[in-house]
Structure formats: C-alpha cells, structure tokens
Amino acid sequence: MVFVHSVGRSILIFKIYILFSIHLSVSIRFISIFFIVALGVAFFSGIQAASPDMRYSGDSYYDETNLMDLRVMGTLGLTDEDMEALNQVKGVELAEGGYALDVLSGEKGSQQVIHLESLGGSINKLSVIDGRIPEKKGECLIDSQLAGQGAFQMGSEAVFETEDDEDSVLKQKSYTIVGTCSSPMYISFARGHTTLGSGEVSGYAYVTEDNFDQEVYTVAYLLAKGAREQVSYTELYENLVKKVQSRVEGIKEERCQLRYDSVRGKAQQELADGEKELADGKKKARRELEDAKKELSDARKKLEDGRAEYEDGVRQLSDAK
C-alpha cells in the first residue's frame, strides 16, 4: 500500500515537473520571441522616423542659411538687366548674382582644384568655423574640410591660378587665409566635379567681389516664394520649385538673345572702331608721307637754288678778276 502510494506520488510529481518544464520552455520562448519582435519593431520604427527627422533637420539648416532653391548660369554671363528680369519672375522671392570659377592651387604635379566663389549677400549664408569673413581684396575664406587636411592653414598664403593665366578673371593670385567655413551648398564629403586637373574638386574658397575682373556675373542664385514653408525633398517642395523653374526658363530665350545681341554689337563696334582707327592711321600716314615728299621737294629746290646762286657768285667773282 505504501509502495503504491509512493509510485502514485512519484507519477504526480513527474507530471508536475513535465508541465512546469513545458510551461517554463514556452515562457522562455515567448519572452524571446517577444523581445525579438519588439527589437524588430523598434528598429523599424527608428528607420521610419530617421528619414523625416533627417529631412526636418536638414530643412531647418537650409532655412537658417537661406540655401538657394535654383541656380542660373549663362555661357555669356549674366548682366544687371538679367538680374532685374529674374527678380521680376513670378514666384521668385530674391535673385542674387555672383562670380564663380574653378582654380588650381599647389605645386605642379600635385595641384588641387578649388571652387572659388564671391561672397554673397542673403543667399547661401556661410557658417564661419574659425577666424572671420574676408573684408578686403586679397583675403579668402577656406573650406573647413579642406583646412582640416592640412593643405591650408590660417594666416598662410593660398595661391590660386586659372587654366589660362594670360586671360585670368582674377585680379591677383595670392590670398591670405583669414578663416575657415562650412557652406550649405556642400552637405556631403564630395565637393563636385570639374574639367580641370584630376576632374574632382578638392574644396571651396570665398573671396570678396572686387577680386574678380569681370563685367558680368557668372552665376545667379534664386529663392522661391513659399519654399521656406515647405519641407525640402518633399513632393510639395519639388512641385513648387519646378513651377518657378519653368517660369525662369520661359524668359531664357529672350534674355539669351538680348545678351547675344549685346555681345555681338559690342564686338562689331570694337571692330568698326578698329577699322576706323586703321583707316585714320593710313590716311594720316599717307598725309604725312605727302608732306614729307613736299618738304623733300622744297628742300631739293632750295638746294638747287642755292647751288645756282653759288655758281653765279663764283662766276661773278671770276669775271671781276
């Protein structure tokens, strides 16, 4: 009887152990699955939230620095009249002209390409990392990323050369580095491509407008009305900017033709002035030649008259003897 009771009790304990083991195993698996799912959901939620957060952060930075919405460039440059026309386009809040070109810096064989621009006004505001903004001709502000590589140091001289120094648009080559900066136009490590040197731009620099020897702007930056209220990279923003871009392109043909006629007219006027100067020069030379011939003829006549007088004098002297 006792034996049966012990066996029954053992079976009961075994059943309880089995049930407890199953319950514990299920609980552990459930908890593991729960945490795996929770981790996946959290990771997915983080990824989902990262894009809008990054977009909002970038948009806030763009608004603070007044990053351009559109950039306009012309092969014949942009005149003050072109800037006025751009500012009159419906949807354009502000248009600013500037000067920009790619230059070479460093020793031959290891030259770097630097994108050099003039300091702007309200658009594409720079953030000074160290030093200050250039205040006069011969000073420059350097890309902080480029300065961090050790190629350019505060207070040192940076030499910028164009591909054709004989036809340079810069008034001087040497510039004193007075500060380093970051620009809203460059948000990645890459600085763009170029036709100079290695084909890659190493960094950028800014100088005052009076360092450029040009009559017209090489680039114009535009802000679109209402773009600040939209979030960058969204469909609403893209559609708004595209409408303004379409209107800007609508005046392109007229402005290009006016600029072409202006350049052509100036060239023709210079040619006409040159031809007139050449004709006047020929006329003057011809007149001077004729005057010289007359003077020579008069001198020859005077010489002959003098010789005749001399011979008469000699003859009279001979007759007197």
Model regions and ranges:
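Membrane transport/envelope proteins' first extracytoplasmic loop
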Residues: 3-321
